């Protein structure tokens, strides 16, 4: 597994805030000690309190609000708001600018993101993974409480992959663009980290406790299944992606019927090949070939 030197959304970047968002109140000259002798103590205290107040931002209506969130939190809000504009603007800085405006911020807030489109895609993938983890954790607790029966491993993994891929449906037409961004060299470390963490969560909640080579094998196989199913989904025109889910069920069943280590090794190699072939299909999608109809 590749190790990120700067994990996305885990290590805040150098904090800065666009000057376009700053209020004119912060541009006042520093408090002059000489002026205190000419004014009342009450007036001097009022000026002091104004200088000690936290930073303020100006919205599009010209109204000010105090800043009680970090830059990272502000970025998360903007990126989340931008997702609703992806169907119209794609995974782009334009979608981020629209997201900022929907929060009554200046479109200049988009300048907070060095690589807008890629950061938006990675934010979406991160949020989807978090939603999946919450879903799996909730199901796990129900089993522990005895209010729900534990699913067979094959069914659990199938449902987990299906639930995760369904999160792409609102952006299915724009997903080839997203995959292209995730495959960019600068984004591959973050993409692999998110993918491996997601697959590991699936196996963890499925009850996998292996510590030998099968730990790596099982995750490699599931990664191949996830990637290949994701690409089938892009080409699927059946109602509610029925063909995609049939493909997924068949791949999971095949993985569960592996009987010995030799078959496991072969399947691991096949998973790697599937991943490479998937990348090629994705590039075709991005150039307008084999588009989903």
From Swiss-Prot:
A cellular component term (GO) from this record? mitochondrial inner membrane
Predominant location category: mitochondrion
Protein location: Mitochondrion
Alphabetical list of InterPro entries matching this protein? COQ9_C (IPR013718), COQ9_HTH (IPR048674), Ubiq_biosynth_COQ9 (IPR012762)
**What does the entry list as the binding residues for a 1,2-diacylglycero-3-phosphoethanolamine?**
219
> Which residues fall in a compositionally biased region of kind Polar residues?
29-38
Keywords (A to Z) from UniProt: Lipid-binding, Mitochondrion, Transit peptide, Ubiquinone biosynthesis
Whether Transit peptide counts among this entry's keywords is yes
Q: Which domain of life is it from?
A: Eukaryota
Q: Where is this region: Disordered?
A: 21-73
What's this chain's function?
A: Membrane-associated protein that warps the membrane surface to access and bind aromatic isoprenes with high specificity, including ubiquinone (CoQ) isoprene intermediates and presents them directly to COQ7, therefore facilitating the COQ7-mediated hydroxylase step. Participates in the biosynthesis of coenzyme Q, also named ubiquinone, an essential lipid-soluble electron transporter for aerobic cellular respiration.
Q: Which family does it belong to?
A: Belongs to the COQ9 family.
Question: How is this protein organized at the quaternary level?
Answer: Homodimer. Heterodimer; two heterodimers of COQ7:COQ9 come together on the same side of the lipid pseudo-bilayer and form a curved tetramer with a hydrophobic surface suitable for membrane interaction. These two tetramers assemble into a soluble octamer with a pseudo-bilayer of lipids captured within. Interacts with COQ7; this interaction allows ubiquinone (CoQ) isoprene intermediates presentation to COQ7 and facilitates the COQ7-mediated hydroxylase step.
What is the protein's given name?
Ubiquinone biosynthesis protein COQ9-B, mitochondrial
The protein's organism comes out as: Xenopus laevis (African clawed frog)
